[in-house]
Design a protein with these regions (language model features):
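Membrane-integral, polyisoprenol-dependent glycosyltransferases
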Residues: 1-125
Length: 125
């Protein structure tokens, strides 16, 4: 049986993922930093290079590869698009809000404070 605590965690995760997913569906990739991550992941996918980050067909050790790996997995599963470029970050945002609720609930033992903390983080993302 799922308790109310787990239902609230799931609801906060789902609220975050759906709202950010809906918002991200209409935004093109325009930020220069975001486009570097996307281009690097596409280049790495093209070369099947899961170890060395690449951009413009050159090795590029500017950032750790975890973000590139998440993007590459998203592209492998759903294809390359602006929307799928934002799936990993949307899932991380949902997990962050759910984790905020869970941790504050464990520390303060107050549902009200935990929900307010999670919603405050949600509004800042």
């Amino acid at each position: 049986m799922i308790n109310n605590h787990m239902l609230r965690i799931g609801a906060l995760f789902l609220l975050t993922v759906l709202s950010y997913g809906f918002y991200n569906a209409f935004l093109p990739i325009t930020d220069p930093v975001e486009s570097n991550y996307v281009l690097s992941a596409i280049t790495m996918l093209k070369h099947n290079s899961w170890i060395s980050p690449m951009i413009y067909d050159q090795v590029w050790y500017d950032k750790p590869p975890l973000t590139y790996w998440a993007l590459m997995i998203s592209y492998k599963l759903f294809g390359i698009s602006d929307f799928t470029s934002r799936i990993p970050n949307t899932l991380i945002a949902g997990g962050s809000v759910a984790l905020m609720y869970h941790l504050v609930y464990r520390i303060k033992e107050s549902k009200h404070i935990a929900v307010m903390s999670a919603l405050l983080l949600f509004s800042a993302l």
